Amino acid sequence: RWIFVARYEGNRTGEPVHFNSHIDVVETGHGWTTDPFGGEVRDGRVYGRGTCDMKGGLAASIVAAEAFLDLCPDFAGAVEISGTADEESGGYGGVAYLAEKGWFSPDRVQHVIIPEPLNKDRICLGHRGVWWAEIETHGRIAHGSMPFLGDSAIRHMGAVLEEMERVLYPLLEGKRTAMPVVPEGARSSTLNVNSIHGGEPEPEEGFTGFPSPCVADRCRIVIDRRFLIEE
């Protein structure tokens, strides 16, 4: 996957500004009434996967940079724009890669603007932290007609989820930040189960019927933990 960085140097020494947007998108999902990658314009709006999150932000950055250069050709510092991959799956091959290679070091960039879609008229000076993790339970496979011969990993995962509901979620909801975070729900620590998979894998083309009649010997969840600055 590609990463691009464009930089325009000013005429004098100053503090560079970097606009960063991610160019990857999540899965298209179902229920589209337009081609998700067609970019159809209707009633002044563009419809397509990623138009909001966040190709619109990238386009706005380019337009803003062009307008600034037209109005202030004799500016100090530099203007940078980057488009990075991998944001939707962790950022390790995108922003983290650029950071590791020194692209955001203080001698190169003093200000970073990320035009993520956070509703209108909302400017943020930071963001909650994130930690993604996997939990996997194991059991013993058996035929579905004789589950007593097996040990269901899905039932074990059910116990994990029940404990999260009983103990972990109330604990996290009790953690509150003193910062002016918006929306209100984001003032607490949060945890989401992003996905759960168990049993025999579905065909690559998607679910077409009942899965294999087996006791699941493995079950896996991916959790998404968001941290407050106080944590």
Feature roles, as predicted:
Residues 22-24, 86, 196:
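Active-site beta-loop-alpha junctions enriched in small/polar residues
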Residues 8, 137, 225-227:
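Hydrophobic beta-strand positions in extracellular immunoglobulin-like domains
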Residues 2, 131-133, 219:
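Hydrophobic core residues within well-ordered beta-strands of beta-rich domains
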Residues 125, 144-207, 212-218, 228-231:
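Acidic-enriched catalytic cores of C-N bond-cleaving enzymes acting on peptides and small amides
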Residues 1-49, 70-76:
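Acidic/His- and Gly-rich active-site-bordering loop/insert found
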Residues 46, 51-168, 185-187:
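Fold-level recognition of mixed alpha/beta catalytic cores in primary-metabolism enzymes, strongest
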Residues 13, 24-26, 120, 142-144, ...:
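Short, acidic Gly/Pro/Ser/Thr-rich loop/turn segments
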